Amino acid sequence: MITVGDLGLKEDKVLESMVLAAKWFAEIAQVKTESLTVEKNPGRLLHKYWKGAIRGEYRVAEKTWSFFCPIWHTGQAVKALVLAYHVTGIEEFLESAILGAEFILHERVSDPNDPDYGLIFGYEDLGYAVNTSAILECLDGLIYLSKATGDKTYWDAVIDALEWLSKKAYINGTGIFRDVYNPSTRSFIKAPWYREGLEGRPLLDDGIFLKGFLKTGKERFRKIFYETAEKLLQDEYPPGNWVKYPPSDVNHGILHPRMAYWWGRPMVMAYLDSKEKRFLDCAIRAGDWYTKAQRRDGGLFRHTYIDLSTECFGHETSGIACASILWLELMEVFGNERYLKPLEKAIKFCMRVQFTKPLNPNLKGCILSKVLPPDGSDKSPYHIRDLATIFYVQATAKLLEPKYRLEINMI
């Protein structure tokens, strides 16, 4: 079993870093009012209730906050905060997680008589339309919080969302989900990234449908999970990744830095549930892809091409933090140290780019996401996205407490 010491790090230093990062959510990045104040909403997201949402974007040069998709970002932050609470016992983290979950529960269809009952308003690329992936990616935080608090309300919201997704978004028998839903017309519309012949995407994110099956015993959830996994095995290219599907760019051969995490990591869950090694082999290929894409200093870039070349700017620290979670889970299954060196480089890189003593108080504790290309001025090129800090907290919490590494064991 991998420990902090195996990475050449001191446990108290990793713990201190994780606590500082979690405090960034609880004390700095979380909206504390029902309406927006200092934050900008450039995408004109139609949320009516903002309290508890994580302000996910911070442009250091302008000192401005904004949002991209606060539903799924907040859901993942809730998961990070619950994990940080379990590791530390700091009540502030659990309170912040509850506040984040309240935002999600407010922003959904909660009337059982409404045809869209269970729908969560995961506004993302279009301010008036819901991304299917955003719904899926917000749910794990609710599962973690339900277990931590004993409050079944959160699990009930997960099941209601899965019912909506299974009936409205999933294309039966295909492993494909329709992507973008307009609640005002109650219809799916073309995604901004639509390509001819691409009906949707095989969304396996967080293995949520398998977790839903393990919680409820509903065979339909399990069927959807495995049909999606099979579709991903069919369409996998390059090994351990999926350039065919957005947000990767098949025309230019650009791979998204978290795709191998969203779709490769649940293959570990498929293996643990089914005992079929072909799923584990796919997860290993995803883990191996990350070792090849990782830069020598431990980081990762937003635009990594199929040939593993990159651009000079546009780092994406969240990608290597996600890789760390996958590597930890794979080594837990293997019982060996296959990914120890890449994991060591990744955690040390994240710790190096953490703001521990900034002059700007909005930055304290967060992980630097990316360095923007020059624009002709001498303004700070730093850009903060909450995702780097979210997945860093998740990764370090799992590193510090091994019992949280294999998630389907926790349902």
Task: Give the positions of each predicted feature.
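Glycan-recognition and catalytic cores of secretory/periplasmic carbohydrate-active enzymes
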Residues: 1-411
